[in-house]
C-alpha cells in the first residue's frame, strides 16, 4: 500500500514538473541613451520618451514593473518612440541639442533633468519631446497603463499640436 502511494505521488510529481508551461511574452523596451537618440533623430524623426527616475524612487520601480513591463506598452514604444531612461541624479555630462548639462550640487540632480521637467522635479516623470522637436512635455508621477496609453498615443498618433489634450481625453477609448 505504501509503495503504491509513493509510486502514485512520484508519477504525479513527474507529470507536474515536466508539463509544458506557457511561456509568457516578456515585454522589452529598447532603452537608448541620449547620445544615440541625438544621432538617430538626424535620420528619422520620432517623439522621444524619457523616463526620468532616481535609484531611490519606489514609484519609479513600480512604473518599471507594472507599466513598462506591459507588452502593449513595450510594443507601442518600440514602434512609435525613441525611449530613454534617464537617472536625474547622474553626474555625467549630458549633451543635448548643442547644449551641455552638468550635475547641479544645489539641486542634487543633473541640469538636464531640470530642463526637461521645467524645474518641476518629481519622480518618476515621463517626458515626451514631440517629433517636431518642440518643448519637452513633462508628466509627473506614476502612470498606470491605461493613463500611460492615452498620453503616449496622443503624441505617438500625431494628435499633439492638432487637438487640445482635454478634447482628445474626452474621445479616447483605452484598448490596453
Residue map of PLM features:
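Thioredoxin-like thiol-disulfide oxidoreductase module
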Residues: 71-74, 78-145, 149-158, 165
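Sec-dependent N-terminal signal peptides
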Residues: 4-14
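Flexible coil segments in periplasmic/lumen-exposed cytochrome c-class electron-transfer proteins
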Residues: 161-176
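Bacterial Sec-dependent signal peptides at the C-terminal "C-region" and cleavage site
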Residues: 15-26
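Short active-site neighborhood of thiol/selenol oxidoreductases, capturing the structured segment around
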Residues: 43-61, 83
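A short beta-strand-turn-helix
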Residues: 29-48, 77
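Periplasmic/extracellular electron-transfer cofactor-ligation site
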Residues: 55-69, 132
Amino acid at each position: 500500500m505504501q509503495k503504491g502511494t509513493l509510486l502514485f505521488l512520484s508519477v504525479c510529481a513527474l507529470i507536474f514538473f515536466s508539463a509544458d508551461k506557457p511561456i509568457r511574452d516578456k515585454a522589452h523596451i529598447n532603452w537608448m541613451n541620449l547620445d544615440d537618440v541625438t544621432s538617430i533623430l538626424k535620420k528619422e524623426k520620432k517623439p522621444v520618451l524619457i523616463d526620468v527616475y532616481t535609484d531611490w524612487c519606489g514609484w519609479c520601480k513600480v512604473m518599471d514593473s507594472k507599466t513598462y513591463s506591459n507588452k502593449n506598452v513595450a510594443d507601442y514604444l518600440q514602434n512609435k518612440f525613441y525611449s530613454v531612461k534617464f537617472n536625474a541624479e547622474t553626474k555625467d555630462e549630458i549633451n543635448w541639442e548643442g547644449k551641455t548639462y552638468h550635475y547641479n550640487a544645489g539641486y542634487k540632480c543633473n541640469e538636464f533633468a531640470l530642463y526637461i521637467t521645467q524645474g518641476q522635479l518629481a519622480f518618476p516623470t515621463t517626458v515626451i519631446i514631440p517629433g517636431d522637436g518642440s518643448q519637452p512635455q513633462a508628466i509627473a508621477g506614476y502612470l498606470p497603463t491605461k493613463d500611460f496609453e492615452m498620453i503616449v498615443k496622443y503624441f505617438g498618433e500625431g494628435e499633439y499640436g492638432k487637438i487640445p489634450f482635454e478634447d482628445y481625453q474626452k474621445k479616447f477609448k483605452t484598448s490596453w
